[in-house]
């Protein structure tokens, strides 16, 4: 299987601290890339949250520390990261099926591996650190010849998931509560 998963990458306290930093941060509607960056709430209903530099640094170091393990898992050298994005999906939030790979001319880097660090749990009711829905759905993982067969991954706080950036994927709608996650991309 071509999905890397590392439960317990962040402990419960670490997840809570990042969620608290997100609560203090400034949230803006997340953009999509279609030849340029635009907000389209029919495709993505998510917020990018600007957090303090200390929190960004903690996450950057954690991701840098796991990069060699992820490189080994995928069998390729990954030498850099784009930088973490802190995403908040409120009730009704989603991100339709898309690719993370940006291979258009003029892009300095080509995303090769996508990272998602879940900060909330799904399926245990709602409240601090919990939501309903918001599953990560990956296509073409179970059988690459059948790109329509999905693999659904339920958010579990502290779990890091990595997959190739060319895989079609989406975030299913959050039906109750808030889904928080951190994303990044290795090159």
What are these model-derived regions, one by one?
Residues 1-162, 166-187:
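Fe(II)/2-oxoglutarate oxygenase catalytic core
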């Amino acid at each position: 299987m071509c999905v890397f998963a590392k439960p317990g990458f962040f402990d419960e306290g670490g997840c809570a601290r990042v969620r608290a930093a997100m609560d203090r941060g400034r949230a803006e509607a997340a953009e999509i890339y279609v030849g340029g960056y635009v907000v389209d709430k029919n495709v993505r209903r998510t917020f990018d949250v600007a957090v303090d530099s200390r929190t960004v640094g903690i996450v950057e170091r954690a991701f840098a520390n796991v990069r060699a393990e992820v490189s080994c898992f995928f069998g390729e050298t990954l030498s850099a990261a784009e930088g973490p994005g802190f995403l908040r999906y409120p009730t009704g939030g989603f991100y339709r099926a898309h690719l993370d790979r940006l291979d258009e001319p003029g892009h300095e880097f080509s995303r090769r591996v996508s990272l998602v660090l879940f900060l909330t749990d799904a399926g245990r009711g709602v409240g601090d650190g919990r939501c309903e829905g918001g599953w990560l759905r990956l296509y073409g993982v179970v059988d690459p010849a059948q790109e329509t067969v999905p693999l659904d991954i339920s958010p579990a706080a502290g779990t890091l998931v990595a997959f190739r950036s060319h895989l079609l994927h989406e975030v299913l709608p959050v039906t109750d509560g808030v889904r928080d996650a951190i994303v990044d991309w290795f090159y």
